[in-house]
Design a protein with these regions (language model features):
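Phosphate-interacting basic helix/loop segments used at nucleotide- and nucleic-acid interfaces
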Residues: 10-17, 91, 150-155, 242, ...
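Active-site phosphate-binding and catalytic loops of NTP-dependent enzymes
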Residues: 16-17, 58-62, 97-101, 116-121, ...
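P-loop NTPase nucleotide-binding/switch module
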Residues: 90, 104, 117-165, 179-183, ...
Length: 498
């Protein structure tokens, strides 16, 4: 060594040139019970991604940290832990729950980890963001004061949606939920569409993309698919990723339509995770974490800071056995800004979209439309409900014309109202045209149709699509007398629901 060499300079030089790798921390797999893996000897935060390596490095499984107790980590694997042996090595792969986001995702179909499902290369996104997002101060959110044209006249005119609103689409199975979702996806005037297909059948992913979206719709969309056969933690991760992508484009000033199908499957995934790590079951077996997760997800949608962009969210909610008192339906109603309920009775009579006005509501409609439109929509809903309440009496001819003038009007307008609520799934209806049509219907009555007031000779078909049929038989006079007598015997005036 040169005696003139400064020792401290030499140390500094060596410390910059020699890079010592950080020591890698390992743990050991000690127990596997059902969906849960338990590891000791490793400290990792919740949400961290770990890699479990079996003997001879031949079997590797990724898992997410979902809980811990004392010195034990609880992990949930992304895939079946087949081939993983006792004492397998557990190491941290990604300590933070982060995801790569960017405009490169547009037009792509990806999984819960951002990997492509469409056969193309992995999107090269440069923005690394926390998966659970960053909460917005409620005082900094902009108001919901702009109409969002969804192209479905029943919703545009009677359940008007605003940019940044959160809506629930509540339906049982087989009542046209997917068809209405497709209409909303294609017809809504939004800059970006983010679709999370969570926990549904795998075959529906390709069908939804090809039939409901199409090439033109996919070009401005991002689809995140997590079918029912994958791990519950991946289904939850896909849900978080869907919200994060929507938040990214919202913060870029875009008006985003986000559709999550379905919120019920998200709750099921959280139930699987919660019960597996020992949470106590509550209503319908759901652990408390479910009732915390859903409002947190829903609050991520809405108008951005100071009105900069918006996320209009549509969450489908499965009403099992058409039970609208299900706990998930209840919490969705409490957390959302309105709901659109689909009725099996309407679907069975080929009435599409099968929107049940009696249970559906938009809580911000009165802030979006003028007073006249709001009053017209209210009258339409009132007449629709009044007819349904008295439908049995009308069907059997027990209602006496003139007993209730408003019900007479409901019967007269019923065919036109039924026709107005139906719409071809390939034909959009502009917002202004929808409003104009409903005003004409209520103010002027049905066009090209003889006004009919309820009388005992009118018999409504069981399907609401049909017009009332007037019977003009030679015995109509005697029929009139006998029916009127029957109506009197029934004391219709007292039985009528007003």
């Amino acid at each position: 060594m040169n005696p003139n060499t400064n020792f401290s300079d030499l140390v500094d030089k060596l410390s910059t040139e020699i890079k010592i790798k950080e020591p890698c921390k390992f743990g050991t797999l000690v127990r596997v019970v059902g969906l849960t893996l338990e590891a000791r000897g490793l400290e990792a935060p919740l949400g961290a991604i770990c890699e479990i390596v079996g003997d001879k490095n031949t079997n590797k499984v990724e898992a997410e940290v979902v809980g811990f107790q004392d010195q034990v980590l609880f992990l949930m694997p992304f895939t079946e832990p087949t081939g993983i042996n006792p004492g397998a090595t557990v190491k941290i792969k990604n300590p933070n729950a982060l995801a790569k986001i960017g405009p490169e995702l547009l037009g792509r179909v990806i999984d819960a980890n951002g990997e492509p499902l469409d056969g193309y290369l992995t999107p090269k996104c440069s923005n690394l963001l926390p998966l659970r997002g960053i909460a917005i101060n409620p005082m900094e959110r902009g108001p919901i004061n702009k109409v969002l044209d969804v192209g479905v006249k029943a919703i545009n005119s009677l359940l008007t949606i605003g940019q940044g609103q959160r809506i629930g689409l509540v339906a049982g199975s087989g009542v046209g939920k997917s068809s209405l979702m497709g209409m909303l996806t294609r017809f809504t005037k939004a800059d970006i569409v983010v679709i999370g297909l969570i926990g549904e059948r795998g075959r529906e992913v390709q069908a939804f993309i090809s039939e409901s979206l199409g090439p033109q719709g996919l070009a401005k969309s991002v689809v995140i698919a997590a079918p029912a056969n994958i791990s519950p933690v991946l289904r939850l991760r896909a849900t978080q990723l869907s919200h994060l992508i929507a938040e990214y484009f919202r913060d870029e000033g875009k008006n985003v339509l986000m559709m999550i199908d379905s919120l019920t499957r998200v709750a099921h995934a959280q139930r699987e995770v919660g019960l597996a790590i020992g949470e106590p079951p509550t209503a319908k077996g759901y652990p408390p974490s479910v009732f915390s997760l859903l409002p947190n997800l829903i609050e991520r949608a809405g108008v951005g800071k100071f009105g900069n962009g918006s996320i209009t969210a549509v969450y489908t909610v499965l009403a099992e056995n058409d039970d609208t008192s299900d706990p998930i339906v209840d919490i969705a109603r409490a957390s959302l800004d309105g709901q659109v309920i689909l009725a099996r009775k309407l679907a069975d009579s080929a009435h599409y979209p099968s929107i049940d006005l009696n249970g559906s509501i938009s809580r911000v409609m009165q802030n979006l439309v003028d007073e006249e439109t709001h009053l017209i929509a209210g009258k339409f809903r009132r007449l629709w409900s009044l007819f349904q309440q008295n439908e049995d009496l009308i069907q059997v001819g027990a209602y006496k014309a003139g007993t209730n003038p408003e019900l007479d009007e409901a019967i007269r307008l019923r065919p036109a109202m039924v026709s107005f609520l139906q719409q071809d799934m390939n034909t959009p209806e502009d917002f202004s045209i929808s409003i104009s049509k409903i005003k004409d219907l209520i103010n002027k009555g049905p066009s090209n149709q003889t006004s009919q007031v309820a009388n005992p000779n009118i018999k409504l078909n069981q399907t609401e699509n049909s017009l009332p049929q007037v019977t003009n038989s030679p015995d109509s006079k005697s029929n009139n007398n006998s029916s009127a007598k029957a109506a009197s015997n029934f004391n219709t005036g007292n039985r009528l629901i007003q």
